[in-house]
């Protein structure tokens, strides 16, 4: 896939999301002149600890998208087993295609060129509702989620939700 084809695909996906918004998130370009860097706002899913949160993240697409997955990084602080302390999201759908050298993921769960920004965001929203404790990016958050979900983990998430509400539209 050429860079031009990649850019056209990203432009089409952005136009589709603006024309037919998907519940739970919105997306736009960080810079109108750069189709490869997007900003997304994710609304914490109802009936989860993240409910009411407004979390800002960036998606950075490779020039050969969709052959390779984008990278996603939360800009808003978030306490979650599958988000490392730098904000980088670690879920299967964002991992390079092919075999997992550690044997945790099946190839069909990893990146496939048929995925879109919409499928990525639906996966991230699902991740917020149901963390994967077996493959954590934040070991401390995963430990708290397993051992003290309604105690320390819940308090840290609540603090992140409050902070996200205060800084959502800065």
Swiss-Prot record:
Autoubiquitinated. SUPFAM superfamilies: UBC-like. The keyword Transferase applies. Pathway: Protein modification; protein ubiquitination. Its EC number is 2.3.2.23. Signal peptide: none annotated. GO terms for biological process: protein K48-linked ubiquitination; protein K63-linked ubiquitination. Keywords: Acetylation, ATP-binding, Nucleotide-binding, Transferase, Ubl conjugation, Ubl conjugation pathway. InterPro entries: Ub_conjugating_enzyme, UBQ-conjugat_E2_core, UBQ-conjugating_AS, UBQ-conjugating_enzyme/RWD. It comes from the Eukaryota. It holds the Pfam family UQ_con. The keyword Ubl conjugation applies. The modification N-acetylthreonine is found at residue 2. The active site is at 90 (glycyl thioester intermediate). Residues 5-166 form the UBC core domain. The modification N-acetylmethionine is found at residue 1. Belongs to the ubiquitin-conjugating enzyme family. This is Ubiquitin-conjugating enzyme E2 G1.
